[in-house]
């Protein structure tokens, strides 16, 4: 313990002993008031960010064969550590991270880099690891004329963002500044971090490109414990790999400078439909779910032709007593609400003619930032979730039968209670235009894609998990040939060939950079670059890539 005590002193008392958040509800650690507080907070995403012993998806807190600590299980059920690290460095400065890396290297400890805990394939935790928690690095600094270190050419307006800054925090600050930035759709996902390093999908993707396309500079602490600047002029191998190569793999990113864009007008359409099973109606709930979804999806190619910067997200969900469909469509850099409205009027007439219930709203935002800075999706944390995703090409999307073919596959998936599908039009437009203009580690087929299809399941009995992996995801992957690949931030943790699915032809270069920059494997994450050389826990190295 003396070594840990000295280490804690070296990082100004920011080392904490970590137990799963459910520990206060079990055994000798039981505390009635604390347990009640945990239970009332468990689905709050911001609370989970603040707790180093919690993740957003609870299945990654547990470890098969090494136990779990489920909040709602019996008081007498033992609380096991699972995949939650025993210690966490709650970093407040880059120096704390440097010291932590040096300590981990000296004592041969596995490191888990943890920010908001949103990772859905288990990269933010690890059995027996030392957690480096960067959620406290909160700086935001806007720049009118950014020149990367070592360079001479201005990149225009930008903002330098600390690793722990949430998307909603950056968007709120950007609105005050009169600019926009590319961030994720969930308010509590970090604005940079693993989100950006994994590529970074966004409702602004078609207008401005992927989040990773807009990264201009990183400050990184390497596996050797060195603090370096990474941009197009220096450490160019890492500048390439950090933009799409995946989070938690190449170093600890302390801050990232990203491009900002002038505030512009936008038109936003929102539609929501709910059909209950227990009401007297002639509508079949499941059939109606897909018919409504299909009618919305049919609009997308025409909207894309009307405004190439259009994005959308359609989410059909099956619940125990009802089905719901929610759709958001965003047309960026236009104030022509009347022309846009003609498309939505067509949709409304179709839904009315078929007797579907819905609510809808069409809004002109003089400033896009007003829409972006609205807080969303903060109360869906604290569940076990698995998911998988598939890219859909522009060729299939614009084919006369393309949307029908997509909907035929989606409607055949036989959703279970709690399942959802996400049809995300987040590519095309500037994502496509950046092909050849922006050189990054991003999966190359993103430049050919328009849609990202995701199936998401709250954890049910194991047989249902296997059906998703053995039947539903293969159906999505067979939608077109060749298979374009998957988005590594919204991925099946058992993706059959993750190297090809996440990075395609870029993988061999990524693997070499990983080997050069982290030869001892300090930063190993599940199905990340170089992980094939290690066991699933990233503890035992057993092979080398041939």
Curated annotation (Swiss-Prot):
First-tier enzyme category under EC: oxidoreductase
Entry keyword set = Oxidoreductase
* The EC number(s) this enzyme carries: 1.-.-.-
What happens without the gene?
Does not seem to affect the production of usterphenyllins and uscandidusins.
Report domain FAD-binding PCMH-type positions: 81-263
The membrane spanning regions, by residue number, are none
Enumerate the Pfam families for this protein.
BBE, FAD_binding_4
Span of the signal peptide:
none
Q: By its UniProt entry, which Gene3D superfamilies does this protein fall under?
A: 3.30.465.10
Q: What GO molecular function terms would the record report? A: FAD binding; oxidoreductase activity
**Family membership noted in the UniProt record:** Belongs to the oxygen-dependent FAD-linked oxidoreductase family.
Identify this protein by name: Flavin-dependent oxygenase ucdF
Source organism (scientific name): Aspergillus ustus
Name of the gene encoding the protein in the UniProt record: ucdF
